[in-house]
């Protein structure tokens, strides 16, 4: 397509790679206008992450849908992933693996992509990432939803409320920030009991690891879950900035020149009369 050729001539990716990325958007049911608007931010994400363009497109289209977002949300979604990649020990592929395990449940419970990603990024900094992180977080989601009274009563014992003044459940980031705030004051046994109540017997050790990491980060002035969520709500331009940084060196400029040359070859080839 003309858009694929345009992207091939002006970015590090070839026209063929751009066409592959567009094909994933088509498979996701995007219309032509959405594809034309969505390809540039996906290109930025792939360049920022130094990853395969088609794979980036596949991840974006899959998990936009899982989080109940639309094609028009593509730019914000890729900025969220780019910000998380830049500010935590994870990458786009690992985020995709984590989303696969927990995004649908998060959406069904009303948790946003921002707070879900904030928790996953914090988990990654504690060494829990990818599908392992997504599975653990999915267990926490499920326990909070199906074992609400027991979780609420247990947390209330330590001064953490899962409901606001109007009786509505607090956001995930608020609940986890509250737990992290009291975690360091609990005995080992109290920590284990609380973790089992919230995450279940199969995943409680992951929650212990996460909270230990959060307590350490808080002691060093790091971001809380709520702070990270707020940052992700205001991360516009992250993917574009990271892509520019990745390509702003001699190797990046050579890649762009090669891509432009490939685009020129296509254009010349199309203008030549048939033999």
Where do the language-model regions lie?
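Glycine-centered helix-coil hinge/cap
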Residues: 190-204, 221, 272
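EAAAR-patterned alpha-helical heptad-repeat segments
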Residues: 114-121
């Amino acid at each position: 397509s003309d858009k694929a050729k345009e992207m091939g001539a002006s970015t590090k990716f070839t026209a063929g790679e751009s066409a592959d990325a567009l094909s994933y958007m088509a498979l996701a049911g995007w219309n032509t206008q959405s594809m034309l608007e969505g390809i540039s931010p996906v290109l930025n994400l792939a360049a920022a992450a130094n990853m395969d363009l088609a794979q980036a497109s596949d991840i974006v289209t899959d998990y936009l849908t899982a989080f109940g977002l639309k094609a028009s949300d593509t730019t914000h979604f890729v900025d969220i992933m780019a910000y998380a990649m830049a500010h935590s020990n994870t990458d786009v592929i690992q985020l995709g693996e984590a989303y696969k395990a927990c995004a649908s449940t998060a959406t069904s419970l009303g948790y946003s992509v921002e707070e879900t990603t904030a928790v996953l990024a914090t988990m990654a900094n504690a060494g829990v990432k990818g599908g392992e992180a997504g599975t653990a977080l999915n267990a926490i989601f499920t326990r909070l939803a199906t074992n609400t009274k027991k979780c609420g009563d247990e947390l209330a014992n330590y001064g953490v409320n899962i409901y606001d003044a109007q009786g509505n459940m607090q956001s995930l980031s608020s609940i986890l920030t509250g737990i992290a705030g009291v975690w360091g004051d609990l005995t080992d046994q109290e920590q284990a009991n609380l973790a089992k109540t919230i995450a279940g017997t199969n995943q409680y050790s992951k929650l212990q690891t996460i909270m230990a990491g959060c307590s350490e980060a808080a002691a060093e002035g790091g971001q809380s879950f709520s702070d990270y969520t707020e940052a992700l709500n205001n991360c516009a331009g992250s993917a574009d900035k990271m892509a520019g940084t990745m390509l702003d060196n001699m190797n990046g400029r050579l890649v762009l020149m090669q891509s432009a040359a490939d685009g020129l070859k296509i254009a010349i080839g199309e203008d030549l009369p048939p033999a």
